[in-house]
Amino acid sequence: MAEERQDALREFVAVTGAEEDRARFFLESAGWDLQIALASFYEDGGDEDIVTISQATPSSVSRGTAPSDNRVTSFRDLIHDQDEEEEEEEGQRFYAGGSERSGQQIVGPPRKKSPNELVDDLFKGAKEHGAVAVERVTKSPGETSKPRPFAGGGYRLGAAPEEESAYVAGERRRHSGQDVHVVLKLWKTGFSLDNGDLRSYQDPSNAQFLESIRRGEVPAELRRLAHGGQVNLDMEDHRDEDFVKPKGAFKAFTGEGQKLGSTAPQVLNTSSPAQQAENEAKASSSILINEAEPTTNIQIRLADGGRLVQKFNHSHRISDIRLFIVDARPAMAATSFVLMTTFPNKELADENQTLKEANLLNAVIVQRLT
């Protein structure tokens, strides 16, 4: 036993270069375990010159300068590797004043991850929380992402031929929410949802969204879209592609319009044929004709498809034609309309002109609703 302790003492001194009394102190504290004593010596701030420990028998220890075997790892190597890993996560370290062990240490800001590393983290986090990789399938237009289960009623068949079938009502959905299917596309410089705009990875407002994806959770903004329903989220890897906004889907016109060839919408005429004839006769008698002056016949094509022909003096004005139309069709009194010529097609804006001044003698006038 004494000889083994002397060998351990000599090897400790040879490895560390410490004095014999100090070496004996560390060995006695470690129960004469050489490896524990050496570890305690360096943890206590021993000599900075760390010498590689060979795994050979302790009878022949050399302090030569020959290169150590690749299979041997020193305490300094372990500490150095750990420091490198921490620097990658925490940022570069700087020392102000003194040496490495006595100076002030300053840790720089964390190193920003590249888009590739960020996308890898998102996919890795999603898989760790149950996401499954699937092949991309091209859907035909109009195909839904998930078939809807039948929720109606039906008849339960009887157990015997003479037993009547019983009607079974379908169960109503327990919630009023709607299922939402969203495609998350991860691009080179950002991400997009469905056919939306590009959102940058570096934008602080998107940090919470990306962190939720990495933890395998549905982001809050997608849960709000579902209104309590289920959210189906697909992730697509486009990290090697630049973002290109897809063309908007074609939407058919759903408004109202007019049939081609129709000058204006038709006006409903609720008057009976007898009442209409009476109104036209009354309107015609309201136009006072001076037989001593020149006269002309004006043909008027109404917006309701009707046609009127009335005699006027050359001195009558365009406003008189308007009054004649209103008297012949009382329903037109509450309708806004203009009078136009047929060829050339122009609006008769100045209704104070006489028929002769407006060159409307024996003309055809068209009524157009506005």
From Swiss-Prot:
Recorded GO CC terms: chromosome; cytoplasm; cytosol; Golgi stack; nucleus; spindle pole centrosome; VCP-NSFL1C complex
Modification sites for Phosphoserine: S74, S102, S114, S140, S176, S192, S272
Annotated effect of mutating R301A: Reduced interaction with VCP
Mutagenesis or variant effect for F343S: Reduced interaction with VCP
Post-translational modification: Phosphorylated during mitosis. Phosphorylation inhibits interaction with Golgi membranes and is required for the fragmentation of the Golgi stacks during mitosis.
Gene3D superfamilies: DNA helicase RuvA subunit, C-terminal domain (1.10.8.10), Phosphatidylinositol 3-kinase Catalytic Subunit, Chain A, domain 1 (3.10.20.90), SEP domain (3.30.420.210)
UBX domain mapped to chain residues: 291-368
One Pfam family named in its UniProt record: UBX
PROSITE patterns the record matches: SEP, UBX
A GO BP entry: nuclear membrane reassembly
Effect of R173T: Strongly reduces nuclear location
Residue ranges of the region described as Disordered: 54-73, 80-116, 138-157
Keywords from the UniProt entry: Chromosome, Cytoplasm, Cytoskeleton, Golgi apparatus, Lipid-binding, Nucleus, Phosphoprotein
Protein function: Reduces the ATPase activity of VCP. Necessary for the fragmentation of Golgi stacks during mitosis and for VCP-mediated reassembly of Golgi stacks after mitosis. May play a role in VCP-mediated formation of transitional endoplasmic reticulum (tER). Inhibits the activity of CTSL (in vitro). Together with UBXN2B/p37, regulates the centrosomal levels of kinase AURKA/Aurora A during mitotic progression by promoting AURKA removal from centrosomes in prophase. Also, regulates spindle orientation during mitosis.
Subunit note: Part of a ternary complex containing STX5A, NSFL1C and VCP. NSFL1C forms a homotrimer that binds to one end of a VCP homohexamer. The complex binds to membranes enriched in phosphatidylethanolamine-containing lipids and promotes Golgi membrane fusion. Interaction with VCIP135 leads to dissociation of the complex via ATP hydrolysis by VCP. Binds ubiquitin and mono-ubiquitinated proteins via its N-terminal UBA-like domain when bound to VCP.
Protein name in the entry: NSFL1 cofactor p47
Organism for this UniProt entry: Rattus norvegicus (Rat)
UniProt gene name: Nsfl1c
